[in-house]
Amino acid sequence: YCTQNSISFSCGIITNGTLLNNYVLQQLSKHNCNMVQITLDGMPEAHNSRRPYKNGNPSFNDVIDSIKKVLAYPKINAVIRINIDKTNINDTDTLLKYLGKYGENLTCASIDFGIVRSSTSACSSYAGNCFADSEISDVLEHLWNELQVNGFAYTPRPMQRWMFCGLYSDSQFTVTPDCSVYKCWEHAGFEQHRVGTIDSEGNLINKTYAFYDWMTRDPLENHECRECVYLPVCGGGCGSVSYNQSKTYHAPGCFKTKGVVEKQILHFVNEKIKTNVEVKK
């Protein structure tokens, strides 16, 4: 369809990595997939306790092998997603050393840290293991430093962001196996958040009120957001956080911004100063 209509198309996938092989990577590349994100939640003990196979067998070694396959494959970028909470934060330093230049030397991969949150009713019992908003900036700053120590090229830099998430655009959706459509994947399966369905020709039909409610979210209409100095780098925050806290998409959805931006700026400036000093030497 895209070729016939001269539309540029690329995609990426998020996967646990256990089914990746050279044939799968070949097919992904053939269909313009340029990014594969694989989740790794700690060293073997921590990861295998969180992400075992259905039969209980460990998956850590298979995931590492899959990451290596992606790194060896041309035209596909590898992203390692590490989900962080209080139960595995101490394990993460060891993991970064294992992945880095002193271990498996997978430094060509990008690292993405996910802050675990108890964002749904099913996850509410896990809240005690999640970091408070006031703790996130210090946690991330420490992890950024560990990335650089272990040979990963990473310099956090605040960016102007009119939308907190791409799911506020008119071209990104979450589609479940029954062809129901949602905007945020955290809402998949919750009827009140379903925005429509996909018909046999791939069209979005049966749009619900939730679609228009989500798409009309405007942080400038919210007094707290409108007066907030973080708005240009936040875009009003996460709609899922907003709904979970206030039962509406139209409230502030502050997450991973306040306190983090300051750390990003300091980290970025310090790296620039260090680079300039080294160049002058």
Regions inferred by a protein language model and the residue ranges of each:
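Radical SAM enzyme [4Fe-4S]-AdoMet core and its adjacent flexible, acidic
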Residues: E45-K68, A72-D170, D178, R194
